[in-house]
Amino acid sequence: YFPDLPDNKGLEGITVNTVNQHVFVVKESQPGLLIELDAECRTILSSRCLSKANGFSHPKVGPDKLDFSGLSYDPRSDSLWIVSDQGRCLFQYDWVQDVVLQRLDLEIGEGKRRLVRKAEGVAIDPECGRVYVVSDRDARLYVFKLAAVG
């Protein structure tokens, strides 16, 4: 899953499951990969390919172009929020069931809507139902209010 340099399709994001302290990292693409490590980051416990088979798809982005650039653990729903730069969207993913629960396009602006460009990081505040997404291209932090988390 990790071809020789100068591939630049390596690990992009990291988060911690606050219930069991397991660490998750996401590989950007070719293939997109989610890796679960023990709390000490010494042992790979499991890994999953992120593909159309488990719901990682976007109607405007081909499967070979969809990438993953950040992730955040949500303890309320025991799920992971994974952001895609190329998809300009956010996936809520259930690790146990190995399925995407929902895909949210990262729309911003008043009036004419546009999408966040080059989304590279995500953090969730489950208490407030907010998701924070950082744009590398615009050097901005966007805040999204979720109608229902989980």
Where are these regions (language model features)?
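Sequence/structural signature of beta-propeller domains
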Residues: Y1-G150
